[in-house]
Swiss-Prot record:
Keywords per UniProt: Flavoprotein, FMN, NAD, Oxidoreductase
Family statement drawn from the similarity comment of this UniProt entry: Belongs to the azoreductase type 1 family.
Function: Quinone reductase that provides resistance to thiol-specific stress caused by electrophilic quinones. Also exhibits azoreductase activity. Catalyzes the reductive cleavage of the azo bond in aromatic azo compounds to the corresponding amines.
Protein name: FMN-dependent NADH:quinone oxidoreductase
PANTHER family: FMN-DEPENDENT NADH-AZOREDUCTASE 1 (PTHR43741), FMN-DEPENDENT NADH:QUINONE OXIDOREDUCTASE (PTHR43741:SF4)
Protein EC: 1.6.5.-, 1.7.1.17
Gene Ontology MF terms: electron transfer activity; FMN binding; oxidoreductase activity, acting on NAD(P)H as acceptor; oxidoreductase activity, acting on NAD(P)H, quinone or similar compound as acceptor
HAMAP family per UniProt: Azoreductase_type1
Assembly: Homodimer.
Cofactor comment text: Binds 1 FMN per subunit.
Gene: azoR
Species per Swiss-Prot/TrEMBL record: Acidovorax sp. (strain JS42)
InterPro entries, alphabetized: Flavodoxin_fold, Flavoprotein-like_sf, FMN-dep_NADH:Q_OxRdtase_AzoR1, NADH:quinone_OxRdtase_FMN_depd
Cofactor: FMN
Amino acid sequence: MQLLHIDSAITGDQSVSRQLTAQTVEAWKASHPATQVSYLDLVADAPAHFTMDAMAPRTGQTDGLSEAQQRENAVSERLVSQFLAADVVVIGAPFYNFAIPTQLKAWIDRIAQPGRTFQYTANGPEGLAKGKTVIVASSRGGVYSTSEGGRAMEHQESYLQTVLGFFGVTDVRFVRAEGVAMGGDAKAQALAAAAQAIEAHVKAHAANQDRVSQAA
């Protein structure tokens, strides 16, 4: 089993989402010892934001690419191949200004490739990255999930659910720690709840794998 571990928080060791992704990966490895882990730090190894040079190789153009286009194509190819090779993807997604970090958005722009992660058909778009499990470690300074107003301001989890679904990923799970900037007690409670969610997601996947094996 191949697991891709992605972090995107700019705050390094102070990051809650990085703490949660590390806990998730360790729990997954404990439950699935044969798992092979690849790591992508989108702050240390950030893809450039999307440009025409990055887009050109994906519009059917194969000959006569400029040096800049070839460089950007190599970056996009590395990232999409890494994503497609993974059975499980763990994504650290902190809540920045009501959405996700620009580094994570730049990664999504690179892997959103027609013919690779999705295609358009006579019946509409079809995702091509089916069969993956994605666990998103979502961290928020405030609390946005418990009120209609808060949910209306949230373009982090909802966006990731949408774009991953567009890629064909139907098994998207969220480990959420919110209210982490609302005092020590609130942060401790949020981290405890997130730890329980990690355990539940890993156990649920292991139980489902056991059922599949028995059915086979």
